[in-house]
Amino acid sequence: MALPSSRRFKSPTTLAFFLVGVTLVVLNQWFLQEHRQEKAKGPVATRRSLAAVVQRSPLFQVPPCVANASANLLTGFQLLPARIQDFLRYRHCRRFPQLWDAPPKCAGPRGVFLLLAVKSSPAHYERRELIRRTWGQERSYSGRQVLRLFLVGTSPPEEAAREPQLADLLSLEAREYGDVLQWDFSDTFLNLTLKHLHLLDWTAEHCPGVSFLLSCDDDVFVHTANVLSFLEVQSPEHHLFTGQLMVGSVPVRESGSKYFVPPQIFPGVAYPAYCSGGGFLLSRYTVRNLRSAAHHVPLFPIDDAYMGMCLQQAGLAPSSHQGIRPFGVQLPNVQRLSLDPCMYRELLLVHRFAPYEMLLMWKALHNPALHCSHKQVAGSPTAGEQNPDAH
């Protein structure tokens, strides 16, 4: 996401520290204001005894996963990157112990209309806090209940030095908000697929009556009211899986790429159609069918392509929605992405927002003084149907 103005900063490091500082100052002032308002209103019904809502899950519920030594016998195995070798050795492992749970999340007299399932990482505290305060607020929109969950693994190896602090911070969040689902697998790119699988299982067990689900990353901006307007004319018992449609995406064969998939994992020429993993919407009907289909589809290291494989297995197809933009909003002949709020007022979801951008956009779109002409509307999404790196 391009920055609104950065020419005054000669050093990227200086700019980064400046933006972080500004964000923290703004957040502090805003949170103090929000706290004063909540205190003046008195207890809020949705913040009910969260100590009883969250649950620290015992590790012994799932047997430990053991590496499959036969993977070493695959042709060319020793030439593969270490991360791909590990993926192949543990590809059969589909269930991991749950460290934090929120089983009563969907309990209550009112059914859940929309569940926001946000893929996050232990170190992304600032993103989670912004989402809680902006588009991810748990509330009722004209009687339609919206709830929120963050899907998290454990700190990856590069975060080992501060893993205890991140674990303590996540524990505080889980107890305070009751919105954290954490499993005991390393939170890496190749393990994003595990978050989808565990979410499907969790939903079936704890929230089977949810009408719709939004799966997204923690660096997206969601116009929640627009999402609800779209969903209110959909049926939860009909198939819905919509987002930025990717058709004809081919596997990346360069071993240095983040999206590298060798023939040992996928020998095919192109992936089945899927929606970019930055964000997509699905119905209760589709959640059930995906869960059943996933049992017959081997794990795959690219999470959104894996969902396309499960859809194909279930005999379903993804669809395109022009209001979901995983590649941002860009004006013609302009190099950087636009942050004009008028370009976002009719969209549902846009990918790649820094925390400070998320806060500013939320405030701008909810400013009663905002006036936009009919011409100030984002055009068609940028072509991404043939881009395998668009995730």
Swiss-Prot record:
Biological process terms in GO annotation: protein glycosylation
Provide the membrane-side ranges marked Cytoplasmic in the record: 1-11
What topology does the record note for this protein and the membrane? Single-pass type II membrane protein
Annotated glycosylation sites = 68, 191
Q: Which residues cross the membrane?
A: 12-32
**Gene3D superfamilies recorded:** 3.90.550.50
Name the pathway. Answer: Protein modification; protein glycosylation
What keywords is this UniProt entry annotated with? Glycoprotein, Glycosyltransferase, Golgi apparatus, Membrane, Signal-anchor, Transferase, Transmembrane, Transmembrane helix
Write out the annotated subcellular location: Golgi apparatus membrane
Principal place of residence: Golgi
Q: Which family does it belong to?
A: Belongs to the glycosyltransferase 31 family.
Instruction: Please report the name of this protein according to its UniProt entry.
Output: Acetylgalactosaminyl-O-glycosyl-glycoprotein beta-1,3-N-acetylglucosaminyltransferase
**What is the species listed in this Swiss-Prot or TrEMBL entry?**
Mus musculus (Mouse)
Supply the gene name.
Answer: B3gnt6
